[in-house]
Curated annotation (Swiss-Prot):
Family: Belongs to the prohibitin family.
GO biological process terms, semicolon-separated: mitophagy
MF-aspect GO terms: protein homodimerization activity
Organism, scientific name: Gallus gallus
GO CC terms of this entry: cell surface; cytoplasm; mitochondrial inner membrane; mitochondrial prohibitin complex; nuclear matrix; nucleus; plasma membrane
Entry coiled-coil feature ranges: 190-237
Described function: Protein with pleiotropic attributes mediated in a cell-compartment- and tissue-specific manner, which include the plasma membrane-associated cell signaling functions, mitochondrial chaperone, and transcriptional co-regulator of transcription factors and sex steroid hormones in the nucleus. In the mitochondria, together with PHB, forms large ring complexes (prohibitin complexes) in the inner mitochondrial membrane (IMM) and functions as a chaperone protein that stabilizes mitochondrial respiratory enzymes and maintains mitochondrial integrity in the IMM, which is required for mitochondrial morphogenesis, neuronal survival, and normal lifespan.
Assembly with partners or alone: The mitochondrial prohibitin complex consists of two subunits (PHB1 and PHB2), assembled into a membrane-associated ring-shaped supercomplex of approximately 1 mDa.
Protein name: Prohibitin-2
C-alpha cells in the first residue's frame, strides 16, 4: 500500500497543489486503516463480550461468543468478561451456637453467569468479585455456624459444608454468580476452647484407664476365686483318695521319680540317684503293699 501511495504521489503534478493532494490521500488512507482496526476486535477463549452504545447504553440482547467481531467505532465499545471459574479464599471469624469464637476459611470457585452479563455490568461492573463475594460469604457463614455448637462443627463438618454450599449458591444467584465448588479449608477455635477440649480429652482418657483397671482387678479376683475353688476341690478329692487307699501317695511318688529320671537321663551330665534320693522309700513294707493294692485296683478298672 505504501508503494502504491508513492507511485500515486509521483504521478501528481509538482508544486503546492500536488503536495496538498498527496497529503489528503495519505490522511484518507490512514483514517481508513485506523477505522478498519478500530472496527474489529477478538474475544479470546473462555471470554464473552457485551456492547456499550453511546446512544442507548448497554445492549441487553447482545452477548458475543469467542472469535472475531465488528463494531461501529466511536459509538460501540466492547466490554469483555472472563467466564472461567476462578478460586478465591475467604476467611471470617464468627460465633457458634454455644457462643464460642470460630475462625473458618472457605475456598470458593465462582464464575459469572454468561446469560446475565449485561445486567451484571449495570449493577456490579467488572470487579463483581470484590463487591459481592466477601459480603455474601460472611453473611452465610455467620448464619450457618450459629446453628451448630463448636463440637458439632467438627463432628458434623460434612453437613456444615453442605449447608454452607446450598445457602451460598442460592445467595449468589441474586448477583448473577454461579458457584462450582465450596469447601471448608480451615476451622479453628480460640486458645481457651482448645485448651478446654484437650483437658476434657485427657480426663476422659484417665477415666477410661481407671475403669479398665477396675475391670482388670475384678477379672483377676474372679480368676483367683475360681483357682482357689479348683485347688480346694482337688485337695478334697486327693484327701478322699488317700483316705480310701493310703497307697495312692506312694504311686504319685513313683510317677514323680519317673519324671525326674527322664529329665536327668536327657541331660549331658550323668547323675546317679538312689531310691532314698528320689524319696521313694522302697524298703518300707507299707509302701509296697499300698502300691500293689492301688495298681491292682486300677488294673481291674
Amino acid at each position: 500500500m505504501a508503494q502504491s501511495l508513492k507511485d500515486l504521489a509521483g504521478r501528481l503534478p509538482a508544486g503546492p497543489r500536488g503536495v496538498g493532494t498527496a497529503l489528503k490521500l495519505l490522511l484518507g488512507a490512514g483514517a481508513l486503516a485506523y477505522g478498519v482496526r478500530e472496527s474489529v476486535f477478538i474475544v479470546e477463549g473462555g471470554q464473552r463480550a457485551i456492547f456499550f452504545n453511546r446512544i442507548g447504553g448497554v445492549q441487553q440482547d447482545t452477548i458475543l461468543a469467542e472469535g472475531l467481531h465488528f463494531r461501529i467505532p466511536w459509538f460501540q465499545y466492547p466490554i469483555i468478561y472472563d467466564i472461567r471459574a476462578r478460586p478465591r479464599k475467604i476467611s471470617s471469624p464468627t460465633g457458634s451456637k454455644d457462643l464460642q469464637m470460630v475462625n473458618i476459611s472457605l475456598r470458593v470457585l465462582t464464575r459469572p453467569n454468561a446469560a446475565e452479563l449485561p445486567s451484571m455490568y449495570q449493577r456490579l461492573g467488572l470487579d463483581y468479585e470484590e463487591r459481592v463475594l466477601p459480603s455474601i460469604v460472611n453473611e452465610v457463614l455467620k448464619s450457618v455456624v450459629a446453628k451448630f455448637n463448636a463440637s458439632q462443627l467438627i463432628t458434623q463438618r460434612a453437613q456444615v459444608s453442605l449447608l454452607i454450599r446450598r445457602e451460598l449458591t442460592e445467595r449468589a444467584k441474586d448477583f448473577s454468580l454461579i458457584l462450582d465448588d465450596v469447601a471448608i479449608t480451615e476451622l479453628s477455635f480460640s486458645r481457651e476452647y482448645t485448651a478446654a477440649v484437650e483437658a476434657k480429652q485427657v480426663a476422659q482418657q484417665e477415666a477410661q484407664r481407671a475403669q479398665f483397671l477396675v475391670e482388670k482387678a475384678k477379672q483377676e479376683q474372679k480368676q483367683k476365686i475360681v483357682q482357689a475353688e479348683g485347688e480346694a476341690t482337688a485337695a478334697k478329692m486327693l484327701g478322699e483318695a488317700l483316705s480310701r487307699n493310703p497307697g495312692y501317695i506312694k504311686l504319685r511318688k513313683i510317677r514323680a521319680a519317673q519324671n525326674i529320671s527322664k529329665t536327668i537321663a536327657g541331660s549331658q551330665n550323668r547323675v546317679y540317684l538312689t531310691a532314698d534320693n528320689l524319696v521313694l522309700n522302697l524298703q518300707d513294707e507299707g509302701f509296697t503293699r499300698g502300691s500293689d493294692s492301688l495298681l491292682l485296683k486300677q488294673g481291674k478298672k
